[in-house]
A protein has these predicted regions:
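Single conserved hydrophobic/aromatic residue that forms the stacking wall/gate
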Residues: 1-13
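Gly/Ser/Thr-rich phosphate-binding loop
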Residues: 18-82, 95
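Active-site glycine-centered loops adjacent to acidic/histidine catalytic or metal-binding residues
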Residues: 38, 63, 88, 147, ...
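Adenylate-forming AMP-binding core of the ANL superfamily, especially NRPS adenylation
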Residues: 40, 74, 80-128, 136, ...
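AMP-binding/adenylate-forming catalytic core of the ANL superfamily
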Residues: 43, 119, 124-128, 132-135, ...
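Beta-strand->loop->alpha-helix junctions that form or flank phosphate-binding loops
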Residues: 58-66, 86-90, 195-197, 241
Length: 275
């Protein structure tokens, strides 16, 4: 029977399909649409899903369990460049704003900040945990997602990372997802995760864990050479590790904190204590 839809739970599952050794044997000519959701999907993976899986009308959705779950989504007629690089626009009857995490004020268009959403889909609260509810939902009923996002002049939202994952190196704010998106463009890189690790000189340094494509040979010098002249010098990972897999939850979400903890152990690093 012909299938026309593909529903995926984020980039992990779609990458497994795209890189399956028998992928070329399957006829996907009847596929046309689907939904990508569950975890951030790199631009390069979205492009491959469109071109290699024939999903010309695929959409992407963003949200969280606490928002029932979708707050933003693209549509089948959203321009392709917006569908692969953003999570679309706010859903009908909901509100979204991007705020400065410190002041709580809305940031200008094109500037990053914390994504907040409000509307009928937002939960009433965490069962039996009023303190946690107050941390997440403010007095005006805005749900603070903890995600860093940018909204353009047309209302398209781009998720640039998690607030807790942002790396501050020598006073420079670095979003790991930006580095991941860049490294995905390397033809030998199958998957990559970037985290911050403690550093005595700069406070934090970047660390990249990389899974190479099957049969490919990669080393640190090749990765650094690929980065030079293409991204700012302080965004080039100081530590590069090649691995076969990332630590994940049972639902397929990558556990960056475990990568960070393992690197701290390997390198004998600890965060500097502050007053």
């Amino acid at each position: 029977r012909d299938a026309q839809e593909s529903r995926g739970l984020g980039d992990v599952y779609k990458r497994q399909e795209l890189d399956h050794p028998r992928f070329a044997e399957f006829d996907l000519s009847t596929l046309r649409t689907g939904i990508m959701a569950g975890s951030p999907c790199p631009i390069e993976i979205m492009k491959r899903v469109v071109s290699e899986m024939n999903l010309s009308q695929i959409t992407i959705a963003y949200g969280m369990t606490e928002t029932s779950p979708v707050s933003c989504q693209s549509s089948t007629d959203t321009p392709l460049d917006k569908r692969v690089a953003t999570v679309g626009t706010v859903q009908p009857h909901l509100e979204v704003k991007i705020v400065d995490p410190e002041s709580g004020e809305c940031v200008p268009v094109g500037q990053s900040g914390e994504l907040c959403t409000r509307g009928y889909s937002v939960m009433h609260g965490y069962w039996g945990d009023e303190a946690k509810t107050r941390e997440a939902i403010d007095a005006e009923q805005w749900m603070h997602t903890g995600d860093l996002a940018v909204m353009d002049a047309q209302g398209y939202v781009n998720i640039v990372g998690r607030m807790k994952d942002m790396v501050i190196r020598g006073g420079e704010n670095i979003y790991p997802r930006e580095i991941e998106e860049f490294l995905y463009r390397h033809p030998k890189v199958q998957d990559v995760q970037v985290v911050g690790v403690p550093d005595r000189k700069y406070g934090e340094e970047l660390c990249a864990w990389i899974i190479a494509r099957p049969g490919a040979t990669l080393d640190e010098d090749e990765i650094r050479t690929f980065c030079q002249g293409q991204i700012a010098h302080y965004k080039i990972p100081r530590h590069i590790v090649f691995t076969d897999a990332f630590p994940m939850t049972v639902t397929g979400k990558i556990q960056k904190f475990k990568i960070r903890d393992e690197m701290k152990q390997r390198l004998g690093l600890e965060e500097e204590k502050t007053a």
